[in-house]
Amino acid sequence: MRTLTTFLALPVAATLVMGLSSCSLFSSGTSTSTKDLEVGNCYNTVSKESGGDKPVGEVTVVDCAKTHTYEVVAQTTFGEDVKGLPNEDSIKSLGEGFCQGEDFTAYVGVEAGKSSYQIEYLSPSADTWAKGDRKISCVVSQGNKSEVKGSAKGSKK
């Protein structure tokens, strides 16, 4: 399981309804490990929740034109020089710093601080780290976990 962390809650914009500018390759919903998500994937509610940070294993990836809750907008990895699982502060620093950066702006079309999206990130857990998982996936939602249709790509929201 990976960990979903919410770190930036901004006011929620009107429901996002857009074209098909960045749809995933999945058309009817495919159960996918969160470590296998890619930028542009849209998906629905996480499979397991336990309070604050949520352990996440599998999600249902759907075409972004279909109703979904989350979208992956950017990804990065811990460098090869990082030997052991970083502490929570290191993960938070990388996740929050990266997910508010240039890749977010390039994908959404507006700086994170001006975006109406709630930004969260998926990070390795101790179990997935031991299996080679080094990826941080930045994801956006409407903040109240409401479902939307269309992609965040180029939305300027």
Predicted regions and their residues:
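Primary mode marks residue(s) on the alpha4-beta5-alpha5 output face of response regulator receiver
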Residues: 5-8, 23-157
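C-terminal motif of bacterial Sec signal peptides marking the signal peptidase cleavage site
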Residues: 18-22
